[in-house]
From Swiss-Prot:
Binding site for 5-amino-6-(D-ribitylamino)uracil: 11, 43-45, 67-69, 100
The name this protein goes by in its record: 6,7-dimethyl-8-ribityllumazine synthase
Pathway stated in the Swiss-Prot or TrEMBL entry: Cofactor biosynthesis; riboflavin biosynthesis; riboflavin from 2-hydroxy-3-oxobutyl phosphate and 5-amino-6-(D-ribitylamino)uracil: step 1/2
Coiled-coil ranges from the UniProt annotation: none
Gene designation: ribH
Entry-linked InterPro entries: LS (IPR034964), LS/RS (IPR002180), LS/RS_sf (IPR036467)
Residues that hold (2S)-2-hydroxy-3-oxobutyl phosphate according to the record: 72-73, 115
Lineage: Archaea, Methanobacteriati, Methanobacteriota, Stenosarchaea group, Halobacteria
Example GO biological process: riboflavin biosynthetic process
Keywords, alphabetical: Riboflavin biosynthesis, Transferase
Pfam family, one: DMRL_synthase
Length: 133
C-alpha cells in the first residue's frame, strides 16, 4: 500500500476543498493511504510542508493540491512558477515523488471549479511514481 502525504492550499478554499475530496477518493480507489494532511495558506506555502512530509519514513510520496486564479497582474504566473520549481527541488533533494496538483495560472474562478480533478490526478501520479520507482 502506498502511503501518501497530502498538502492542501487553503487559498480559493471553495475549490481546494473539492480538490482535496477528489484526492482522497483517488487514494481510496488506488488502495493508497493518506498518512497525513497539511493545510497551508496558499500554493506558494506548500513546498515547506511537502519537504517536511517527504522527510518522513512513513510517507512514500507527497501530493500537493491548490488553485491559482488570475488577477489583475501577472502575480499568478509568478506564484505558479515559483511553486512548481520549488516542489521539483523538494522531490529531487528528498528522492521522494512530489506531485503537482495545482491548477492555474491564467484561469478564472469558474475555470478553477472545472479543474478539481487535478486533486485526483496528483494522487494518481504519486501512486504511479511510487510503484514505478
Amino acid at each position: 500500500m502506498t502511503r501518501l502525504g497530502l498538502v492542501v492550499a487553503e487559498f480559493n478554499r471553495s475549490v481546494t476543498e473539492r480538490m482535496e475530496a477528489a484526492a482522497r477518493e483517488a487514494a481510496a480507489d488506488a488502495d493508497a493511504a493518506i498518512t497525513d494532511t497539511v493545510h497551508v495558506p496558499g500554493a506558494y506555502d506548500s513546498p515547506l510542508a511537502a519537504d517536511r512530509l517527504a522527510r518522513r519514513d512513513d510517507i512514500d510520496a507527497v501530493a500537493v493540491v491548490g488553485a491559482i486564479v488570475t488577477g489583475d497582474t501577472d502575480h499568478d504566473h509568478v506564484i505558479a512558477s515559483a511553486t512548481a520549481d520549488t516542489l521539483t527541488d523538494v522531490s529531487l533533494e528528498r528522492d521522494t515523488p512530489v506531485t503537482f496538483g495545482v491548477s492555474g495560472p491564467g484561469m478564472s474562478g469558474a475555470e478553477a471549479r472545472e479543474r478539481v480533478e487535478k486533486g485526483a490526478a496528483a494522487v494518481e501520479s504519486a501512486v504511479s511514481l511510487t510503484q514505478e520507482l
